């Protein structure tokens, strides 16, 4: 372990947000210090990681903001990793932590990091797993990962979070289709947010009934994140959730599998691949599958 890496680890463990921010940037941007830093981490895997996902417009950021307020009222420290949509052109974040959670940004008990998904499938940023391990090295009591609001494709959150919360809203009724088409399988808890709106009670009842018909014992909690109603009940459910040893093993297996996949893909140069494709695509009978076989057999 180099002196620089040791210094960063010690500062992160002491709660130094500047060192934490730099370490995360190292990982996100594949800085030369990133790999030795990750090898030297001693993450505290007892820190719960809560994934919050759901369709666009469900009020996920407002809900996270309200949870942070309630949690820090207990003088406990929380980290929020907010994964934003990316521009397909510059791969940058289109939103931002200061806009979404400005009210909490100066609270010393809260660390907020926004990162772009950079086109990653499943609603998660490419380096979310590694960054979560960096956060687990700091003295937080809870970590929240809020993912891109793209509905059912956010299944990847299961490979990261100890508990997955799916946030829905009552007004259109279309959210039930989201539940049926994929989110059902990943939720540990459902939140019907914007519960002040018409139809919230019947929507929550319909959702609970559907879950019971499928013999699934998953809580449904109604919240109004703007006014704060239901937030204490939600936080209590989050803090009382018990992760099984089987789930912990599954999470670590998923983590290791993704790291191995990433390591295998590291030598694939996208620009070189594009140049090779540009040359090959003009040949008669071009076949992308044959191209890939030949590309990797070189």
Can you name each region flagged by the protein language model?
Residues 3-50, 55-58, 67-153, 163, ...:
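Nucleotide-state-sensitive switch-loop elements of NTP-binding domains
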Residues 59, 63, 230:
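Conserved glycine(s) of the Walker
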Residues 76, 108, 160-163, 185-188, ...:
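Short glycine-/polar-rich loops that comprise or flank the Walker A/P-loop
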Residues 94, 131, 156, 160, ...:
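Alpha-helical scaffold elements adjacent to nucleotide-binding pockets in ATP/GTP-utilizing enzyme cores
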Residues 114-115, 166-169, 191-194, 222-223:
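Conserved beta-strand segments of the P-loop GTPase G domain that flank and frequently precede/overlap
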Residues 133, 137-140, 153-171, 181-191:
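Inter-motif core of Ras-like GTPase G domains
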Residues 189, 195-243:
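Canonical P-loop GTPase G-domain recognition
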Residues 222, 233-298:
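Long, well-ordered amphipathic alpha-helical subdomains in the mid-to-C-terminal portions
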